[in-house]
Amino acid sequence: SGYSEHVPKLIYRDPKHYYPYLKERWGAHPPEFGYKDIIPEFKAENWDPAAWASLFKEVGATYVVMTAEHHDGWANWDSDLTPWNAVDKGPKRDLVGDLGKALRKEGLKYAPSYHRERHTGFFAKDQYAVHSEPHADIAEEIKRVPEAAMLYGPDFSYSKNYVDDYVARWKEIQEKYNPDMLWMDDFPIYTRDGNRVRKGQAKPEIQYLDDALR
């Protein structure tokens, strides 16, 4: 039901499929046990960025794109903006930074990718609507563990707060890692509110992207 990187969302959108598995595997399901509670098991014990970089060069790659953040709100870099990052939780190391250093030693270009454009709808009651609220079980998880709001949210709408947060994280990646290229995902083409996202609410980050490329 869906594909791997969308499982965090599908847990809540397809509970008949996923809740029994979580119950069997971890003894509970949302809201008692949700996506946030799986993160400690992400340890990256076999993560060897030097070996990866060497292999990429060997096969003839000239640049590498690694996911800095997908739609789920988890940051694979050493972020000062969210506690849900790979240095403070999970692997306890800077995955984005470590790979970048290894790639540059091999003379390869580096482009952390950023997919937060679709984050507001990932855990929302109404997917990709301009204005929504958290899925019921997500809301209950946040009520029980307030820190979870920084993973699942902080907003579930294309609000000014969302845009400010989006730009701040994107800017942090640029300032900390100085990537050779910028790669970002697309904003949802359609929304239930007349596609206002593409028509205006994304302008701040698009302008920042344009300025950063110049």
What are these regions (language model features)?
Residues S1-R214:
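Mature catalytic domains of secreted/periplasmic carbohydrate-active enzymes
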